[in-house]
Design a protein with these regions (language model features):
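Short S/T/G/P-rich N-terminal loop/turn motif that feeds into the first structured element of a domain
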Residues: 1-87
Length: 87
């Protein structure tokens, strides 16, 4: 199962860390082992590391309105999102 990293900027680290939206969006896709990271020097930079069983389904889900709504709720700045795939 490939590991995926989503790196992006956020508005508020405390809110982002406590949000249930990651599990709500990625859980039905079978995504597991979701871990969160925040830059200690700049708390507006954050990342999610997760195991993704189906990259095509994951990438399709990231293009949906549900993903846009989850990112908005979480305070993610979508224009800063970079997805890194394990190779």
């Amino acid at each position: 199962m490939p590991t995926v990293i989503g790196y992006h900027e956020i508005k508020d680290a405390k809110h982002w860390l406590s949000s249930p939206k990651r599990e709500e969006l990625f859980g039905p896709l079978g995504v597991t082992n979701i871990r969160t990271f925040v830059d200690a020097q700049n708390p507006t930079r954050a990342a999610v590391l997760m195991d993704v069983p189906d990259l095509d389904a994951f990438q399709a889900a990231m293009q949906t309105e549900a993903a846009a709504e989850a990112m908005n709720y979480d305070g993610v700045l979508p224009e800063t999102l970079v997805i890194l795939l394990e190779r």
